[in-house]
């Protein structure tokens, strides 16, 4: 009789409507929040009277109180005559006394259209696919762009811009859940957005994560930095301003807080040689020596106190994670500088990865597979480059994984039901759709 009563209770539970389902046949999809990579954010700026340009032409907009697009750069701004002006406006200043980063004096910046997918650059193919699934911008589909020049810092160190972004992201995820019947959100991040998302999740209380985040889909999550991060600080490569002189490119790269987050971490890279010169070999274990060698001594303090502590270890985020990344693409692994030292062009030794991120870093999240309570799925995409996630082949696989994550199968409700029955062995007919 006791068994029959339990079966009857299960039948009643399975017949109940979904707790978060909207009336009138509304969508059962969980909301999706997109966190873009470094280059997929828009950045606007305006100049105030406090701006003192290095060259008069750079202050042409000064005092006009008009916003202009700082990033992505347009063709005119990238030309040789204008590139130094753009670099000046995009630079940050690290204040060692305040222990934080800020804009150059007189430059005010903002990230437009927060919460809307209109803010994203290059994500249209994925957005269209998600809309075809039933998502709508501002309804169950949101975006969390950010000022890619900044990052966050460990506890005890201020990070005004990064902390403000995390606060906005918290409110956005809570709002997305509220607008969708209390269903937790699926966070989809790419590249640098994965690093931010990971640190964001680790900074939220576990109860909050379990309540508001159903799943994190991480695309090209290089959670251990990458080799190009060191070369970028040495030469300024990857600044997006090819017409800027190399020394100015390097100064721009070194000014940005996020550049230090790109450096290979000791935990993931260990003693692997990343930069080799005539007299020295630099790995993730002697980054401070590398920073001194390239003349970036002012970067040592923020690296040691604000970056290294955040990446000494990779504790599991304790939310379900799908990690997707490309493999089998030639990826810079070691940069060998010749007689000219850091003034010259390095010879590049290649290894496996996605063309930008090294395989050892892309695989870093896989250590979570042995953590009790951490759900992890890894999807490797042969031949897919770092920026190739929105190509036709990769996009289909990305959408398929997101679709699995957002579908509102009541996993937690069923887990409770079967926990209720865990002392019995019998078969219950399960309706299609489970």
Curated annotation (Swiss-Prot):
A biological process (GO) annotation for this entry? lipid metabolic process
State the top-level EC class.
Answer: transferase
EC code(s) of this entry: 2.3.1.-
Q: Which GO terms describe its molecular function?
A: O-acyltransferase activity
Give the residues annotated as active site: 191 (acyl-ester intermediate), 354 (charge relay system), 386 (charge relay system)
Q: Does the keyword Phosphoprotein apply?
A: no
Q: Which keywords does this Swiss-Prot/TrEMBL entry list?
A: Acyltransferase, Transferase
The UniProt entry, under Pfam families, shows:
LCAT
What family is this?
Belongs to the AB hydrolase superfamily. Lipase family.
What is the official name of this protein in its record?
Lecithin-cholesterol acyltransferase-like 1
The organism's taxonomy opens as: Eukaryota, Viridiplantae, Streptophyta, Embryophyta, Tracheophyta
């Amino acid at each position: 009789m006791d068994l029959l009563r339990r079966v009857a209770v299960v039948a009643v539970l399975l017949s109940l409507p979904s707790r978060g389902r909207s009336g009138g046949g509304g969508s059962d999809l969980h909301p999706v929040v997109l966190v873009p990579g470094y280059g997929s954010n828009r950045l606007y700026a305006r100049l105030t009277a406090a701006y003192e340009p290095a060259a008069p032409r750079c202050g042409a907009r000064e005092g006009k109180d008009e916003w202009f697009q700082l990033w992505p750069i347009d063709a005119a701004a990238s030309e040789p005559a204008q590139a130094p002006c753009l670099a000046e406006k995009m630079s940050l200043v690290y204040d060692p006394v305040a222990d934080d980063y800020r804009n150059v004096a007189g430059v005010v910046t903002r990230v437009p259209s927060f919460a809307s997918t209109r803010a994203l650059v290059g994500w249209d193919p994925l957005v269209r696919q998600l809309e075809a699934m039933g998502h709508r911008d501002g309804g169950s589909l949101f975006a969390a762009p950010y000022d890619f020049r900044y990052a966050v810092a460990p506890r005890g160190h201020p990070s005004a811009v990064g902390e403000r972004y995390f606060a906005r992201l918290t409110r956005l995820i809570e709002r997305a859940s509220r607008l969708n019947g209390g269903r937790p959100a699926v966070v989809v991040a790419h590249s640098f957005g994965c690093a931010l998302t990971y640190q964001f999740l680790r900074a939220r209380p576990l109860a909050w994560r379990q309540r508001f985040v159903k799943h994190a889909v991480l695309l090209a999550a290089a959670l251990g930095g990458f080799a190009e991060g060191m070369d970028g600080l040495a030469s300024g490569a990857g600044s997006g301003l090819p017409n800027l002189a190399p020394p100015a490119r390097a100064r721009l790269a070194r000014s940005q807080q996020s550049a230090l987050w790109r450096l290979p971490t000791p935990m993931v890279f260990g003693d692997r040689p990343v930069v080799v010169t005539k007299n020295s070999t630099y790995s993730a274990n002697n980054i401070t020596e590398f920073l001194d060698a390239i003349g970036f001594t002012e970067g040592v303090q923020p690296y040691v106190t604000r970056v290294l502590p955040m990446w000494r270890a990779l504790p599991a985020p304790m939310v379900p994670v799908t990690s997707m990344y490309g493999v089998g693409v030639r990826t810079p692994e070691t940069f060998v500088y010749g007689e000219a030292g850091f003034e010259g062009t390095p010879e590049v030794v290649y290894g496996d990865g996605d063309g930008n991120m090294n395989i050892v870093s892309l695989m870093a999240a896989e250590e979570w597979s042995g953590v009790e309570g951490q759900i992890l799925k890894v999807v490797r995409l042969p031949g897919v480059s770092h920026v190739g996630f929105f190509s036709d082949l990769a996009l289909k696989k990305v959408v398929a994984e997101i679709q699995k994550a957002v579908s509102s199968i009541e996993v937690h409700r069923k887990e409770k039901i079967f926990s209720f029955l865990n002392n019995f062995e019998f078969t219950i007919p399960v309706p299609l759709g489970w």
